[in-house]
Regions:
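Cytosolic juxtamembrane amphipathic/interface segments immediately preceding
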Residues: 6-20, 97
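Membrane-helix interface/capping segments
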Residues: 46, 71-93
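Long, highly hydrophobic alpha-helical transmembrane signal-anchor segments
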Residues: 16-61, 138-141, 152
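Short membrane-interface loop/juxtamembrane segments of multi-pass integral membrane proteins
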Residues: 88-110
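Alpha-helical membrane-embedded segments
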Residues: 146-175
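Alpha-helical transmembrane segments and their membrane-interface junctions
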Residues: 36-37, 112-137
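Hydrophobic alpha-helical membrane-embedded segments
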Residues: 57-79
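Cytosolic/matrix-facing juxtamembrane and C-terminal tails of multi-pass cellular membrane proteins
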Residues: 4-11, 169-198
Length: 198
C-alpha cells in the first residue's frame, strides 16, 4: 500500500464488528442525514460559507486536531497496557498479518484514519464550495437536485463513518482500556508484523 495511504489501512482491518461500524451504521446514518437535508420543504443550503458544508468544515477541523493530538500519547506511551493485544475471541488483525493487533497499533490506525479523513473531507467541502456556483449556473434546473445528491450522499456516508469511528475511539479511551482481556495473549503484537504463511 502506498505510503501516503497508510492511514487508510484502518478500513482493511478484519474484525467481526467491522461490518456494523464500517458499513451498516455509516450508510444508515449518511442516508438519513442526506434525506433530511434534501427532502425538507424548504431545502437546507448545502454550498456556501454559512451553509451545511461551511458549518461542517469547522467541526471537521476541530475533530482532525483532536485526532492528531490523540496520536501523541498512543505512539509515545510505552506502558504494557497499550502493548497488549486487543481482546476478544477474534481480535482485529490486518489481512497480511498472522498476529492480532496490539491496542497501540489499533488505536494508531484508528486515529490516523480519523485525522486523514477529516483533512480529506475539509478539502472536499472547500473544493465543492468553490466550484458549486459555476456548476449550478451551467446545469439545467432539473438536474441540479440529482447532482447535489450525488455529492452529498457519499460525503455524508464518509462523515458518518468518521463520527462512528470517533465514538469507537472514545470508547477505547474511556472504557475498553480499563477492562482486562478475556483471552490469553497470543505472540507479541508490538513486534514486527508477521506475514501469513501460504
Amino acid at each position: 500500500m502506498p505510503t501516503l495511504l497508510t492511514p487508510f489501512r484502518y478500513v482493511t482491518i478484519r474484525h467481526q464488528a467491522k461490518l456494523l461500524y464500517d458499513v451498516i451504521l455509516p450508510i444508515t446514518l449518511g442516508l438519513a442525514v442526506s434525506a433530511l437535508l434534501l427532502g425538507l420543504t424548504k431545502p437546507v443550503p448545502i454550498f456556501g460559507k454559512e451553509a451545511y458544508l461551511g458549518q461542517i468544515q469547522g467541526l471537521l477541523t476541530i475533530l482532525g486536531g483532536f485526532s492528531v493530538a490523540a496520536l501523541t500519547p498512543i505512539t509515545t506511551d510505552k506502558s504494557d497496557m497499550l502493548g497488549q493485544p486487543v481482546g476478544g475471541l477474534r481480535p482485529p488483525r490486518l489481512p497480511s498479518e498472522r498476529l492480532p493487533l496490539s491496542r497501540r497499533r489499533f488505536l494508531a490506525y484508528l486515529f490516523g484514519y480519523l485525522a486523514a479523513s477529516c483533512f480529506a473531507l475539509v478539502a472536499l467541502s472547500v473544493l465543492a464550495n468553490l466550484v458549486a456556483p459555476q456548476i449550478v449556473s451551467e446545469v439545467a434546473a432539473g438536474k441540479r437536485f440529482w447532482l447535489k445528491a450525488a455529492f452529498l450522499v457519499p460525503f455524508n456516508i464518509w462523515l458518518a463513518h468518521v463520527s462512528v469511528a470517533t465514538l469507537l475511539g472514545l470508547f477505547y479511551f474511556t472504557e475498553r482500556l480499563k477492562i482486562a482481556n478475556r483471552t490469553a495473549k497470543v505472540g507479541t503484537p508490538d513486534a514486527a508484523p508477521s506475514p501469513e504463511r501460504s
